[in-house]
Amino acid sequence: METYKDSTQVSKSSLKKKIQGFGGFLSGMVMPNIGAFIAWGLITALFIKTGWLPNDNLSKLVDPMIHYMLPMLIGYQGGKLVYDTRGGVVGAIATMGMIVGASIPMFLGGMIIGPLGGYVIKKFDKAIENKIPTGFEMLVNNFSAGILGAALAIISYVAVGPVVAGASTGLGSIALAITNQGLLPLIAVVVEPAKILFLNNAINHGVFSPLGIEQVQHLGKSVFFLLEADPGPGLGILLAYSLYGKGSAKNSAPGAVIIHFLGGIHEIYFPYVLMKPFLLLAVIAGGICADLTFVLLKAGLVAAASPGSIIAILAMSPKGGQLPVLAGVAVGAIVSFVVASIILKGSKEKSKDNFEEAQNKMKEMKKESKNQTTANSENVKNNDELVSSDIKLIVFACDAGMGSSAMGESILKKELKNANIDGIKVQHYSVDSIPKEADVVFVQENLSERARKSAPDANIVTIKNFLDRSTYEGFMKKIKK
């Protein structure tokens, strides 16, 4: 019976990692191009007929950007994830065939054919490795990319494009039906727990963004851009901890409120929920009520808001659409706060041990980080050697490589500067894009396996909260010796 239980746990853990890996791959195609999406969203919000500054001439930018530029960028990034720049070029060529072969924006198509283009050229290069006559390398490399890219573009135009266009239209119809039937708020039952498992970027950019862009074509805005980006439920959790929490959780919550609500880094509140899993009820309740408010008030954004900051959300709101958006965010925050407050106050009265366990978890983070830096990989044999010669690159990695990891990078850079330690580069990356030459990698606990796969020779330091300075203090003590 014990063996069965263990194998089941391993199976669940493996499935979770696979889902996270797939989600990370999807978001990895979109996140580096978020600036382009924001540019398109701003131009749309400003210059279309119903925009803030209607301009028939400048509004001509809207359609080419959404039909050509954005899908091409996704296709290029998808190919690049599989096989660097060469894969990106073939992925972009293949995506172009799909764009021309369909009358709707091919975001889903770019996510499919871009990585496929990268995969095809990668396999081709491997097949002809060490078989090219000396002096013909450039000729073969250039023509192979051109020929394979052209072939994939034709296949995409003739066969794949129409199929994906049909699938995209079908998904759009399903999304519209769900909205019309009033079932959209129930999506929070899936979305909010999935966010806590670090699938937030995959959900937002892999699922909701394509659906949202499809809806924008018809309605000029979409509620799908708000479902994951809404900071309300997380804000309620942090406010409840600020008033009714204890110890380090209470002390750190007010600072986390600013980072979450204004900075848009939602990962900051995940550890607070993980400390008390019952708080999932609070974020789910807040999410349902917020989504219901969005639907009733016909709220929506013109493009994806990333990061999920209230500033970005308001910037992506259509003209006259700010109040419905703010109302939904406020309702989500209030409901989440009320439910979380009841849970926190109830747990204090009924069992102090529960909260003490949560505090012990926070203390364990410090011990764990100290042990992790010495035990995760046996490369850390002599701390003095690491300072003088071994550590050249420290990487902070999160799912998307743009939010919480950047905060950790900033904190450690200051620690190194204060300690007068030079010559160590500190950078942040997506967990699936960690450079092989990384010496030390700081990563969230449930992404550690993906980090080891990306950088097998690095020392992995697991961390629950990138704002927890105790981890960095322990690390600094070791490299100062």
UniProtKB/Swiss-Prot annotation:
Q: Which Gene3D superfamilies match?
A: 3.40.50.2300
Cytoplasmic-side stretches of the chain, per the record, are 1-33, 81-143, 196-282, 345-481
**What keywords does the record list, in alphabetical order?**
Cell membrane, Kinase, Membrane, Phosphoprotein, Phosphotransferase system, Sugar transport, Transferase, Transmembrane, Transmembrane helix, Transport
Q: What is its EC number?
A: 2.7.1.197
Domain (PTS EIIB type-2): give its ranges: 392-481
Signal peptide location in the record?
Answer: none
Bilayer-crossing residues are 34-55, 60-80, 144-165, 175-195, 283-302, 323-344
What is the superkingdom listed in this entry's lineage?
A: Bacteria
Q: Which residues lie on this side of the membrane: Extracellular?
A: 56-59, 166-174, 303-322
Q: Which CDD domains match?
A: PTS_IIB_mannitol
Task: Output one GO MF annotation.
Answer: protein-phosphocysteine-sugar phosphotransferase activity
Q: Residue positions of the PTM Phosphocysteine? A: C398
User: Which PROSITE patterns has this protein been placed in?
Assistant: PTS_EIIB_TYPE_2, PTS_EIIC_TYPE_2
The processes (GO biological process) annotated in the record are: phosphoenolpyruvate-dependent sugar phosphotransferase system
Q: What is its main location?
A: membrane
Its GO CC terms?
plasma membrane
Membrane-protein topology: Multi-pass membrane protein
Biased-composition ranges, Basic and acidic residues, are 354-370
Please give the record's induction comment.
Answer: Induced by mannitol and repressed by glucose.
Q: Where located? A: Cell membrane
Q: Which reaction does it catalyse?
A: D-mannitol(out) + N(pros)-phospho-L-histidyl-[protein] = D-mannitol 1-phosphate(in) + L-histidyl-[protein]
Q: Where is the PTS EIIC type-2 domain?
A: 22-357
| Assembly and interaction partners | Homodimer.
Q: What is known of its domains?
A: The EIIC type-2 domain forms the PTS system translocation channel and contains the specific substrate-binding site.
The entry's function note states: The phosphoenolpyruvate-dependent sugar phosphotransferase system (sugar PTS), a major carbohydrate active transport system, catalyzes the phosphorylation of incoming sugar substrates concomitantly with their translocation across the cell membrane. The enzyme II CmtAB PTS system is involved in D-mannitol transport.
Kindly provide the name given to this protein in its UniProt entry: PTS system mannitol-specific EIICB component
